[in-house]
Structures are given as structure tokens and as C-alpha cells.
């Protein structure tokens, strides 16, 4: 794999986003590789899975360059199929999953991080569910995952504003389970060591019970997000959002 690294060492597996020259922006190839890595982790004997980015950040979200050309229904279907598979596999994985964020976690990158059981961020990290800036709605289960962590009212406000959150702000509102200083692999180490000394099989059973009650809601949200994304990608606001992003100016939305 070119853009995603996978390693498994006994009870701990790591999935590392590795497209640093593009801030780990998720293009079609990278998403496909991420799907493969998540499937490998799910099938492994590991009981803990760590998701992190290499270099200077976690993920800037979906690659904006995939959105600059005319809407391609076939590519859109492939992308959404892959995003949904990654989301469901990460969320349902019979492991204890940890996302360790450093740098930026934005858009789809943040949605994927929120699939984890335990979400950590480096103290200087920045988090944003910023689809609104290009006239889109969250995907990757972002609506469900935000609602689950911070409630519908706060989730809606965050999605509508696209506000950038510091790690401390995100922790205060319940979006994070903790913060750390320095490298994400080292930052996650204390909690991994605690987990390795815990009855992980029982913890994973509890995870499965909770998720069996919620999985149909996540699947429904993914379906609704797919439909909404397809509609919004055809709007003038989305086209203006993309142009403004590329031209490094404020968008002029007209609805």
C-alpha cells in the first residue's frame, strides 16, 4: 500500500495514514487502501487498534481535487461505497479502537476518527467538521458520530458553523476522551498499556452489546448522508465553495 501503512505486533495493530505531502487528504486510492487496512486489522488477532497519521497531522479530510471535475455518478458510488465500508468496519470492529489525532483532523478525517472507541488529540491539534465551507454535509457517519458524543443540538451547531476547535475546546464539549503532548504513537501509549492490563475480551463484549442497539441508526445515517451528498454536489453553493477554496477567498453562497 502506498498511502496507508499497517502493522500488527501481538495484541496491538496500527493503521497509519501516510500521504503527508497532501496532509493525508483522502483520495480514491487512499480510501481503498484504508478499507484494506481496516479489514486486515479486523481479521487480525490484535485486540487493540490504533489509527493515526504520520508526519504533521491526522487527515485534512476528503481530497478537494476529487470534487473539481464534473460530477461522475460512477466514481461517486465507488467513493461512498468505500467510505461506508470503512466507517462500518471501524465502528463495529471487535477490538478496542483508538484514534490519536495530531495536527488537523477535518471533514471526513474527523468522521473516521470519531468511529473509534477512544478519541485522543495532541494538545495543539485542530478539529473541524467543516463540510459546510464547500456547501456539503458530513459523510462517514459524521451526523451520527457527533450526535452520539455531544448530542443533536451541539452537533447541528458544529456542523452548521464548521468551527475549528482546539483540542481543549473539543475535550470540554465531550468530543475527545483525552489529550496528550507530542507524537501520537507515544501519546496513545499510556492508554494502550492500561488496556493491555485490562480484561479486553469482556470490554469488547460490552462494546458489541451497545453497538447492536445502535448499528441500524448508523446505517440509516450513512444512507441519508449519501443521498444528501449527491444532491449537494450538484448545487451552485458547492461549486462556489470549491472555487473559493481553490482561489483562497471567502465563498459567496446564494442558495
From Swiss-Prot:
Topology within the bilayer: Multi-pass membrane protein
UniProt keyword terms in alphabetical order: Cell membrane, Membrane, Transmembrane, Transmembrane helix
SUPFAM superfamilies cross-referenced by the UniProt entry: ClpP/crotonase
Spans traversing the lipid bilayer: 96-116, 126-146
CC annotations in GO: plasma membrane
Localisation: Cell membrane
Location, primary (coarse class): membrane
Family: Belongs to the enoyl-CoA hydratase/isomerase family.
PANTHER family: EG:BACN32G11.4 PROTEIN, ENOYL-COA HYDRATASE
Protein name, entry field: Putative enoyl-CoA hydratase/isomerase YhaR
Name of the gene this protein is made from: yhaR
Amino acid at each position: 500500500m502506498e498511502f496507508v501503512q499497517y502493522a500488527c505486533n501481538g495484541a496491538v495493530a496500527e493503521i497509519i495514514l501516510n500521504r503527508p505531502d497532501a496532509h493525508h487528504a483522502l483520495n480514491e486510492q487512499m480510501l481503498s487502501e484504508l478499507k484494506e487496512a481496516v479489514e486486515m486489522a479486523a481479521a487480525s488477532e490484535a485486540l487493540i487498534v490504533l489509527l493515526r497519521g504520520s508526519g504533521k497531522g491526522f487527515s485534512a479530510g476528503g481530497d478537494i481535487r476529487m470534487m473539481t471535475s464534473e460530477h461522475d455518478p460512477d466514481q461517486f458510488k465507488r467513493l461512498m461505497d468505500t467510505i461506508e465500508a470503512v466507517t462500518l468496519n471501524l465502528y463495529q470492529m471487535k477490538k478496542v479502537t483508538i484514534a490519536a489525532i495530531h495536527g488537523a483532523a477535518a471533514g471526513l478525517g474527523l468522521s473516521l476518527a470519531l468511529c473509534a472507541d477512544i478519541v485522543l488529540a495532541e494538545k495543539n491539534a485542530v478539529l473541524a467538521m467543516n463540510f459546510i465551507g464547500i456547501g456539503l454535509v458530513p459523510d462517514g457517519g459524521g451526523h451520527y458520530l457527533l450526535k452520539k458524543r455531544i448530542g443533536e443540538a451541539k452537533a447541528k451547531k458544529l456542523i452548521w458553523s464548521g468551527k475549528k476547535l482546539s483540542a481543549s475546546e473539543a475535550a470540554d464539549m465531550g468530543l475527545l476522551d483525552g489529550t496528550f503532548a507530542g507524537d501520537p504513537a507515544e501519546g496513545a501509549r499510556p492508554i494502550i498499556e492500561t488496556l493491555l492490563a485490562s480484561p479486553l475480551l469482556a470490554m469488547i463484549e460490552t462494546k458489541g452489546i451497545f453497538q447492536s442497539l445502535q448499528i441500524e441508526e448508523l446505517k440509516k445515517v450513512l444512507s441519508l448522508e449519501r443521498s444528501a451528498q449527491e444532491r449537494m454536489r450538484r448545487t451552485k453553493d458547492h461549486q462556489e465553495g470549491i472555487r473559493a477554496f481553490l482561489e483562497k477567498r471567502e465563498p459567496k453562497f446564494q442558495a
